[in-house]
A protein has these predicted regions:
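Hydrophobic anchor at the beta1->P-loop junction of P-loop NTPases
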Residues: 36
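A cross-kingdom feature that marks ATP-driven nucleic-acid transaction machinery
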Residues: 1-17, 50, 54, 66, ...
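Walker A (P-loop) phosphate-binding loop of P-loop NTPases
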Residues: 40-41
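Interdomain motor-coupling "hinge/lid" segment immediately C-terminal to the ATP-binding subdomain
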Residues: 2-10, 123, 129-238
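Conserved lysine of the Walker
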Residues: 44-45
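Structural recognition of the conserved hydrophobic beta-strand(s) that form the central parallel beta-sheet
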Residues: 92, 117-123, 143
């Protein structure tokens, strides 16, 4: 325990707190048990350490990673109980999905150690509700995404820009500070390597490929009990998607291409989406049926397009991927039967600066979203502005 505490304290002391992500202010940190899930690489660990460093006393706090070798000979519950007996008040557990039987032991901690507050992180494929009904009533679940364009500017330039609502964006009310006279250069930089907080690291593209590989080879198979053979098929499927997006999925064709049972493909797509690798755009059916069929499949974010595509990503694909990625954090985004996207009653057509109004002429409330323009007018909105929504 002493060594575990020392490692925890050292990590906390080294944590950079200069920039705080959007999720930092959304989590009710005083809740007794909270889980933060999200794709690999989006900064969940850093967020925990920042909160500890800025708000808690280290003597009351323990941060552990569930994949630590320490847990080869110790249980989570045993560790939590000993820490609580020593006066500990706040336990932070990273990578909870790496610990077998995590749900049972967290329930034991909750029920038997009422003075101990627990915050833990997990993979986004982790289903906190699967087989853990008792735990799900005790824990608050938050999902964290990668950097918005707004956050990227904050991290890269140290410039704080307020969040803009969708109404402010479509009314062309997004105002950038004077330090950013021309946003397009930064925007194109973001599309290439701005979504993940480790964008400044050497070998960014290599690390991003490692994130994808670990998700497909470890996270998804571990959760779904897939064999090594299935994990290989997931990698093949990922490459097919990367080279084809955006596309309307034909399950029979894809199944033939990668030699899998077509009946398994919807499950593969769902898990890859939950893991933050792809995004599926549905038609809106409304009513009790909820989500309609999948109309298009995209990579989750534009950085993945640059990292995984075997050629230069299509510019139209980049534009649509960016819009879908940024807007679905706070909004339900659906396929438009006459254009590209729908949010509530608003229709959005995405294109370059020469894009015309024809596509949305019959829309109840239509907007043209243009890349390569700095400012908008009327129902013409610059694409980069949609990166200010979180």
């Amino acid at each position: 325990m002493e060594l575990l505490k020392q490692l925890s304290d050292n990590l906390i002391k080294r944590t950079d707190t200069r920039y705080l992500r959007y999720m930092y202010h959304q989590i009710p940190w005083s809740n007794r048990m909270t889980v933060l899930v999200g794709p690999r690489g989006v900064g969940k660990t850093t967020l925990l350490l920042q909160y500890i460093k800025l708000n808690l006393q280290m003597k009351d706090t323990l941060y552990v990673s569930a994949e630590s070798i320490y847990f080869a000979n110790h249980t989570l519950f045993e560790t939590a109980m000993k820490f609580s007996q020593l006066g500990g008040k706040h336990l932070f557990i990273d990578e909870i999905h790496k610990y077998k039987g995590w749900a049972t032991e967290l329930k034991m901690i909750y029920d038997n150690l009422p003075t101990l507050q627990v915050v833990f992180t997990g993979s986004s494929v982790l289903d906190i509700y699967k087989g853990t009904a008792d735990l799900s009533r005790r824990v608050l679940v938050f999902t964290m995404q990668g950097l918005s364009f707004r956050e990227y500017i904050g991290m890269e330039k140290g410039i704080d820009i307020p969040v803009s609502t969708l109404e402010q964006i479509v009314n062309n009310e997004v105002v950038l500070p004077e330090e950013i006279e021309h946003p397009l250069a930064l925007f194109h930089e973001y599309l290439c390597k701005g979504y993940y907080p480790f964008s400044k690291d050497e070998g960014y593209r290599m690390r991003l490929n490692q994130v994808v590989s670990m998700t497909l080879e470890t996270d998804i198979p571990q959760y779904a009990n897939y064999t090594v053979m299935v994990s290989r098929k997931l990698k093949e499927l990922m490459q097919v998607i990367a080279d084809s997006v955006p596309f309307k999925p034909n399950m029979s064709t894809i199944a033939t291409t990668i030699k899998v049972d077509r009946n398994n493909l919807p499950d593969y797509f769902e898990l890859m989406e939950r893991a933050g690798l792809i995004a599926q755009l549905h038609e809106s059916t409304g009513g009790v049926r909820g989500l309609g069929k999948v109309e298009k499949v995209y990579l989750d974010n534009t950085n993945l397009s640059f990292a995984l595509s075997s050629s230069m990503p299509d510019i139209g694909n980049q534009r649509e991927t960016f819009f879908f990625n940024q807007m679905r954090v706070n909004h339900a985004v659906f396929n438009s039967p006459i254009s590209d996207f729908m949010i509530e009653d608003k229709t959005f057509e995405i294109g370059g600066k020469k894009k015309g109004q024809k596509q949305i002429s019959e829309a109840k409330e239509g907007y043209i979203v243009k890349d390569d323009i700095e400012t908008g007018m009327g129902n013409v909105i610059p694409l980069w502005a949609f990166g200010m929504n979180y």
